Amino acid sequence: MKKILSIILTLTLSATVFAQPLPKKLEHNEKMAWWRNAKFGMFVHWGPYCLYGGVYNGFNQRRGGAEWIMNRCKIPVREYRAKACTFNPVDFNAEELVLTAKNAGMKYIIFTTKHHDGFAMFKSNASEFNIVDYTPFKRDIVDELAKACRKHHIKLGFYYSQTQDWCNPGGGTIRKEMKEGWANPDSVAIDNFTQENLGGWDCLQRSASLDDYFRKVAIPQIKELLTNYGDVAVMWWDTPHRISKETAAEITAELAKYPQVITNDRLRRPDFPGDYKTPEGRIPHAKDIER
């Protein structure tokens, strides 16, 4: 009997010592299980760009969503910052928003923590251009939303524009011609300027390098989002352009500390495919949704 027990113990220890990690696909399936079952969620797209209502200098923005008004209408950085300084959404109620999602049968919420304008909807030590330090509102909307989501068992994910940032020095800019904005009499000169400046229209945007921006703003803010608000379900990147392979790898290494976080395919293409695809402006086929 002792010999049998000894053999069993030896086999058990051998299995423990030589056990291999789960196959990558199985790990992916395990992480994605809740996402596949959830099927229905809320994407909250909100920031100080809403103050313009799609109108600049009396002209309607000619193309695109309101969140693109700063770029398409070429609003100077100082002017946009001054407008953002008045952002004061005193009627915001995280509890109401989360319950609206829950009562509709939604299982998760994705919130725009920072869109391309560079304004952080959370308290950030990496940039003063945030809702707590820069506005009379003085409240951390992401914190309030995270607490309400935990209370009502709704998963929370963060949209974060990692490359484009039009107000923090060095942030990326995608070139849009003035014809997409408004009838500016200096449109030709502005278009020439953006052609020569990587899409930027304000000298403040080119006062630092993109690497400086990632080092001082984007990567520190990503760390803040991952550490300050409890369990994060999703990181929803946007604009996979100009970011270097090395920078994307650094962000991915940070994400490795949080294996539960699901990511999309917009960090850097094609090297960093993420967990699911994000077709836009069309109804996708099933094969176009997940890698």
Language model feature labels by segment:
Residues 4-14:
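Sec-dependent N-terminal signal peptides
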